[in-house]
Each structure stands twice: as C-alpha cells, then as structure tokens.
C-alpha cells in the first residue's frame, strides 16, 4: 500500500503567515497613502487660496503701489503647479480611500505602483521648481538688490507688506506639499519593494 502524500505549502505563498504579512503591509501602505494624499491636497489648496487673495494696494507719496501675483510669472507658475498637484492629490486620495475599504489599490500591483511612483516624482519636481522660483522672487521683493550700482531692484515689501507675507505663506505651504509628495514617492517605492519580495 502506497504511503499518503502530504503537500506542505511553501512559506510565503500559501501559508497563513504570508497572508497576514502581506495584509499588514497593504493596510499600512493604503492608510498612509490616504493620509499623505489628504495632507498634500490641504497644503496645495492653502497655497492657491493664499496666493489668490494676496493682492494689496497701498498709497505712497509717489502714488498708489499695487502688489499682485499676476505681475510675476513665478507666482503664476506657483499657482498653476499647486492647482495641478491639488487636483491630482484629491483624485489619489479618493482612490486611496476606496483601496482601504476594498483592501486593493494602486500600491497592490506592480504596474500601478510604478505609475504612482512616476506621477508622484513628476508632481514633486513641478512643485519644487515652482516653489524655488517663487522663493527667489519673494527674497528679491523683500530685500531688494543692487548690482554694482548699475541695476537696482527696490524692496517692494516696504509698500505692500501684506502681499509679501501672503506670498511667503503660500511658498511655505508649497514646500510642505513637496515634502508630502516626496514621502508619497518613498511609500510607492516601499510598496514596490514588498511586491518584488512577495514573488520570491
């Protein structure tokens, strides 16, 4: 009589330990992803709103002086970049919310995780470039610049301090949004790492 054959499931594929390990990592990625997306949407929305209401007009002995974002291409780019990232973050937050409920999401599969990593990287690059350009203009407006007596940029903030304070707040919010996007990129990379190890 032949001896019975006992099939032992390979560890990491069919075992309960593997399932709970994968489920634990998926829950962490999904919940953290939703939190980061929500915070990013809040930071970028704040930057856009603050920039849009930053216009200020003040009277001087030479007449009226107006500070507004429309007059600075760097500030226009800052608003556009934050608006684009805001829309993307809201859509990603909705998807992340459903992924928490369904226990399946973009970070559960390699192709979608790679796409998430790429889009996050591009969005973070656009946001940091806009924030850096706006920061250079803001510093110039606050401190002025004298290039060996040949060119002089006046300190605009002496006349429109509210405008400068608001733009500074928007720039800070933009850098916060960039930091959150950077963390989202790391999260996608972490998900890809665990997905690749789950195959072996």
Swiss-Prot record:
Name the predominant localization: membrane
Q: Which InterPro entries match?
A: CASP/CASPL (IPR006459), CASP_dom (IPR006702)
Membrane topology value? Multi-pass membrane protein
Question: Transmembrane among the record's keywords?
Answer: yes
Task: Please give one Pfam family short name.
Answer: CASP_dom
Q: Which residues cross the membrane?
A: 34-54, 78-98, 121-141, 169-189
Q: Which residues lie on this side of the membrane: Cytoplasmic?
A: 1-33, 99-120, 190-200
Q: Which residues lie on this side of the membrane: Extracellular?
A: 55-77, 142-168
User: Under the cellular component aspect of Gene Ontology, which terms does the record hold?
Assistant: plasma membrane
Kindly give the PANTHER family that the UniProt entry links to this protein: CASP-LIKE PROTEIN 1U1, CASP-LIKE PROTEIN 4A4
**Record's subunit section:** Homodimer and heterodimers.
Protein name per Swiss-Prot or TrEMBL: CASP-like protein 1U2
Where does this protein come from, organism-wise?
A: Physcomitrium patens
